[in-house]
Amino acid sequence: MAQVLRGTVADFPGFDERADAETLRKAMKGLGTDEETILTLLTSRSNAQRQEIAVAFKTLFGRDLLDDLKSELTGKFEKLIVALMKPSRLYDAYELKHALKGAGTDEKVLTEIIASRTPEELRAIEQVYEEEYGSSLEDDVVGDTSGYYQRMLVVLLQANRDPDARIDEAQVEQDAQALFQAGELKWGTDEEKFITIFGTRSVSHLRRVFDKYMTISGFQIEETIDRETSGNLEQLLLAVVKSIRSIPAYLAETLYYAMKGAGTDDHTLIRVVVSRSEIDLYNIRKEFRKNFGTSLYSMIKGDTSGDYKKALLLLCGGEDD
């Protein structure tokens, strides 16, 4: 049965954008800032509602809400609030643009977003990217990456994955055999074969291929990728496989490793929590609890502090005991 996806943030009932705009203005006016009011209000409104508040704020006060928030807040808390204020349809495109901009490429961001978004989502991202930045996402990716990693990204950006339909067992067998021949049975690796199969077959078909692969080879496909590839390509192929198996489980793992060990990858923490808060953050929480023996809520609690922590916990939407 298909998993029902649930976010942790939804439209606020009885929403009044003018009242909210006034509350925010009061929280930032004069000496000192009432961070508590700002974070409580913004985390309990949907992204569409936050956009309406920004319009009302400008209408009532002739001021830009985002500029005011930026000048009143600092550090990670500011970054989180700024992310919440970005229109959701722009957010992924914005993150990709910044991953490609300037010296060095942030492959981690490219991999995470491009591997875990559906073909429909990717098409929407590409359209917004072009409207906002006046260049094609695919061209920018090609200009900033190379080799098989680049080719896999380009295949995914075509967003031409087969739609889910009745599974053809003969084709499943053929693909599983082809992957086995291209990796474990070959001196060297036929990366092209992995790229084509992973990038174009339907999700339900690939799940069967992974099971069949295990039967034929005695290995999980992840183990083979680990042995046969390396670097950015390995990370991308693994992200694709994990997303095919379960997007919420893949993103739960992404969050776990953003916080595990010394230091926290706050950029990833903010990006995943904000971008999934209205899509599947509830499912991500459940997978997190199941796979890591602790809850997302308690890990955020132990890993962050101050208003930043309070806001993240409100977005997380509850504890999973």
Swiss-Prot record:
Keywords: Acetylation, Annexin, Blood coagulation, Calcium, Calcium/phospholipid-binding, Hemostasis, Isopeptide bond, Repeat, S-nitrosylation, Ubl conjugation. Pfam families: Annexin. It comes from the Eukaryota. GO terms for molecular function: calcium ion binding; calcium-dependent phospholipid binding; heparin binding; phosphatidylserine binding. Signal peptide: none annotated. Annexin repeats lie at residues 15-86, 87-158, 170-242, 246-317. One of its GO terms (cellular component) is intracellular anatomical structure. The modification N-acetylalanine is found at residue 2. S-nitrosylation is induced by interferon-gamma and oxidatively-modified low-densitity lipoprotein (LDL(ox)) possibly implicating the iNOS-S100A8/9 transnitrosylase complex. There is a cross-link at residue 29 (Glycyl lysine isopeptide (Lys-Gly) (interchain with G-Cter in SUMO1)). A motif ([IL]-x-C-x-x-[DE] motif) lies at residues 314-320. The modification N6-succinyllysine is found at residue 290. There is a cross-link at residue 29 (Glycyl lysine isopeptide (Lys-Gly) (interchain with G-Cter in SUMO2)). The modification N6-acetyllysine is found at residues 70, 76, 79, 97, 101. The keyword Calcium applies. One of its GO terms (biological process) is negative regulation of coagulation. This protein is an anticoagulant protein that acts as an indirect inhibitor of the thromboplastin-specific complex, which is involved in the blood coagulation cascade. Belongs to the annexin family. A pair of annexin repeats may form one binding site for calcium and phospholipid. The [IL]-x-C-x-x-[DE] motif is a proposed target motif for cysteine S-nitrosylation mediated by the iNOS-S100A8/A9 transnitrosylase complex. Monomer. Binds ATRX and EIF5B. This is Annexin A5. It comes from Bos taurus.
